[in-house]
């Protein structure tokens, strides 16, 4: 008797799909996403077609942080897409700016992520 084993999912494919879903959930355009992960916006189109993003690359590491932020916001809001988009597009006194603009830099991404993690810790 042979046992069928499930092949291990391709980490690069999983990350590409996750970051594209996270960007959609956060209301980010392709250009916004490109700015966050540090690539040209045409690279996002190529990533969609190829379906891969190397988790070990700098872009991959930034994508993982963005996915973490999106998941935390999803948990906080119970999946309320309107609230998530409102949070991303309006000035926030606690983060010191508009989160969608702040996450265009690594420092801003970390600031917003720390804020969301801190709020999530209180819930």
Q: Can you describe what each PLM-predicted range is?
A:
Residues 1-123:
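Non-transmembrane "mature" sequence context
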């Amino acid at each position: 008797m042979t046992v069928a084993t499930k092949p291990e999912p391709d980490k690069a494919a999983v990350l590409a799909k996750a970051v594209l879903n996270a960007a959609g959930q956060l209301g980010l355009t392709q250009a916004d996403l490109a700015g966050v992960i540090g690539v040209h916006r045409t690279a996002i189109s190529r990533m969609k077609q190829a379906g891969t993003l190397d988790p070990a690359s700098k872009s991959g590491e930034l994508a993982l942080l963005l996915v973490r932020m999106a998941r935390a916001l999803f948990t906080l809001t119970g999946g309320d897409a309107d609230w998530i988009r409102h949070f991303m597009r309006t000035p926030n006194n606690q983060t010191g700016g508009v989160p969608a603009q702040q996450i265009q830099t690594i420092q801003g991404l970390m600031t917003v992520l720390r804020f969301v993690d801190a709020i999530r810790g209180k819930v």
